[in-house]
Amino acid sequence: EDPVGTDGLVTVRAIIPKGEIHADNLDALAEIAEKYGNQNLYTDNRQNLSIHGVEPKNIEKVKNAIHELGFRTEGFFGIRDIVSCVGTTHCPKAVSGTRNLFDALLKITQESKYDLIQKQGFINITGCPNSCSPYRIADIGFRGMRIRAEEEGAVEGYEMLIGGNEEAHGKKVGDFKSEDIPNIVRDLLDLFLAENLNKETIREFIDRKGLDYVKSKLLYEEIK
């Protein structure tokens, strides 16, 4: 649902994939905010933008205008609202191309079968130990790394944690090649979809079932 303020006016949000927006689209969103909102754009901790002060009668007009720019207005604060740092695209400290993993995981989470669980967890991706996208406190978190493989030598990979939040860091599932992670995430989401109870979060599911049980249900090859 769209947040409603004490004044009865509504906040309409736009999901900004990877937190990156072209200057022309930013200008266009600013024009929408000037016409229908309080003339400001606001950022949030999931790298998205929102327009405050929209009259209820204008909600659909604002959303349609945002959709025409290619941005979604649904799916906030869930598994489809993935956060990633810039990775090797810009950062000299990054060791993994977080953008590619973002695209692969977003494609999976947008499958219709996950509609029922899309509000029950967060996914964060960071390209190095600095954790600019805090992977340790996400339901599903990834930290970029270089890992040794028998034939390829050092390859791009990620440490994967599950079950984290602001109270406790996630538990380590393992270190994996980048190419293997999408299938691992799909297996995890399928398991959660089948066995979660009473709309529990992914973290609550991990706590209830235990890390060993969850790992036993995932098909993967960890890099030792």
Regions found by a protein language model. Give the residues of each.
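Long hydrophobic segments that form regular secondary structure
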Residues: E1-V10, P17-N40, I181-V185, L189-K199, ...
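Acidic/polar loop patches that form or flank catalytic/metal-binding clefts of enzymes
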Residues: Q118, L197-I202
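Accessory RNA-recognition modules of RNA-modification enzymes
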Residues: E1-T11, I16-G19, H52-G53, S131, ...
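Mobile "lid/hinge" segments at catalytic clefts and subdomain interfaces of large enzymes
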Residues: T6, R136-N198
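Small-residue-enriched alpha-helical segments and adjacent helix-cap loops
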Residues: R13-E152
